[in-house]
Amino acid sequence: MSYEVSEVINFLDRDKSQFILDYMTSLKFPWLYMNCSTYENDGNNMFSNVLYSAWKGHVIGQGKSKYYDKVCKELVDKIKPLDILKIKANLTTNVDTYKNVFPLHTDFENVKNGLTSIYYVNTNNGGTAFENGKFVKSEQNKLVTFPMHFKHRTVPHTDFSYARIVININYTR
């Protein structure tokens, strides 16, 4: 299986990247605790905030959350998706070791022309690992994009960063 994973460094201008980091780490941006990361009872936990969902039955209903414009608008404008399925911010906290192994997964299955982009809000020694062994390090203002059917997983950080923050964007093009 051929993996086409693209990385773009300095995806947004520096001021916008810093604004997103400052806003998402302020008291103005809520994080909701989840006692699983990928699958129910997977032994991992994280915080998240769904910023956009195309499904009526989802937590925020259909459409944009009130945080969408401040956090996502410029990202989406630059990515230029045909249709957005879901945008979710994820925050994982520091772990002592890499013993916390997040499971490989796909965000959606059977989506024609589906892509996933992960925008790294901050820098730390965590990242994203792919089924083929490729590792993308969490670096502020980097965007990694790959076909939605590629299995990937969170690699938690162990350095002195308080959190690993990403914005996960699922869409078609």
Which functions belong to the PLM regions below?
Residues G57-R173:
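Catalytic core of non-heme Fe(II) oxygenases with the double-stranded beta-helix
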Residues M1-L82:
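Non-heme Fe(II)/2-oxoglutarate
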